[in-house]
């Protein structure tokens, strides 16, 4: 009994099976407009791209808005003068000396927490308001969360708050995929700035 085998012949087709007609203008690979890009300080101008500033020119962390400091001061006075003497008020100096206050608290961070980093710990990207809230909520230590949240949102919407700077900080943090929190990341960036 013989087994039949099939042989496949490799046919070379010389005619196209279908035809494609472009609907618009075809882009030339040597487009003159691409060659004429204007560069200014290392960034492209008029390219239609969103550029992420990974190393901005000395963007400093802005001091807290005056309305934020005033409202926190009022809330602390209200907490002290209230009849609830069992509430412990943490007295944070309101003159906002970043180098002395925050550097002291974040100097001895535990690096062993970063060793246990897994895919399940990946966080959602933060926006500008979340960055603002995370950084300045430290000033309201001891104040109830719901009161502090309303104070921070009022400060965020005040005209003296530059929201674009916080947007840059949030984009940098999201791009870097830092394993630490936002406040630790931004303090490390501020201390390493030239």
Swiss-Prot record:
One of its GO terms (molecular function) is sequence-specific DNA binding. It is found in: Nucleus. It comes from the Eukaryota. Keywords: Activator, DNA-binding, Nucleus, Transcription, Transcription regulation. GO terms for biological process: positive regulation of mating-type specific transcription, DNA-templated. Transmembrane segments: none annotated. Pfam families: MATalpha_HMGbox. Its main location: nucleus. GO terms for cellular component: nucleus. Residues 121-177 bind DNA. There are three genetic loci for mating type genes in K.delphensis. MAT is the expression locus that determines the mating type of the cell, whereas HML (containing HMLALPHA1 and HMLALPHA2) and HMR (containing HMRA1) represent silenced repositories of mating type information. The mating type is determined by the MAT locus, which contains either a copy of HML or of HMR. Diploid cells are usually heterozygous for the MAT locus. Mating type proteins are sequence specific DNA-binding proteins that act as master switches in yeast differentiation by controlling gene expression in a cell type-specific fashion. Transcriptional activator that induces the transcription of alpha-specific genes. Belongs to the MATALPHA1 family. This is Mating-type protein ALPHA1. It comes from Nakaseomyces delphensis (Yeast). The gene is MATALPHA1.
């Amino acid at each position: 009994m013989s087994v039949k085998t099939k042989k496949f012949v490799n046919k070379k087709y010389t005619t196209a099976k279908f035809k494609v007609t472009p609907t618009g203008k075809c882009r030339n690979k040597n487009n003159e407009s691409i060659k004429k890009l204007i560069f200014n300080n290392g960034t492209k101008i008029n390219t239609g791209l969103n550029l992420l500033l990974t190393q901005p020119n000395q963007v400093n962390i802005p001091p807290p808005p005056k309305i934020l400091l005033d409202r926190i001061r009022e809330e602390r006075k209200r907490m002290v003068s209230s009849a609830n003497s069992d509430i412990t008020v943490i007295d944070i100096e309101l003159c906002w000396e970043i180098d002395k206050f925050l550097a002291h608290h974040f100097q001895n961070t535990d690096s062993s927490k970063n060793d246990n980093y897994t895919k399940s710990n990946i966080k959602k990207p933060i926006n500008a308001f979340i960055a603002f809230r995370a950084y300045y909520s430290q000033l309201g230590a001891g104040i109830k969360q719901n009161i502090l949240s309303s104070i921070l949102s009022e400060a965020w919407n005040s005209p003296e708050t530059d929201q674009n700077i916080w947007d840059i900080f949030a984009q940098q943090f999201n791009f870097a995929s830092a394993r630490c929190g936002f406040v630790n990341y931004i303090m490390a960036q501020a201390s390493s700035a030239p």
